[in-house]
């Protein structure tokens, strides 16, 4: 449910910041333990079609091992964005040619240090905001604090500050 709740918080932050959004979870046919996908649509005008996203602008990967089982880049748009929880050095992160911006953070270690458990969804919210700027950080922090308390809100801010960003093809 961490993925689903993170998607809901992104939408809430967009709406609170004056835009529109919707989140759509997808659980697939597998049983417990299978990867969970959540789609988020953000816009400055109302969003009518409530369907899966087949050509994302951004992909957020909460667990980097998922890349061994699923093509997380499937359909990503030209000039796409990747936000990745990883222990890898930025130079070792491999992305397709369509990705122009990569953000990495070790959300697992940050969460373990701060919370004592590997809850990566809140940390990845901070990384997403740092990389894209599509939603206000203060709105994310406020909603996370409302749901999970001050320690999780501080986790968002810490991950935001520790996120490394790389622009690809000299667009930096």
Where do the protein language model's features map onto the residues?
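Active-site cofactor/cluster-binding pocket
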Residues: 1-172
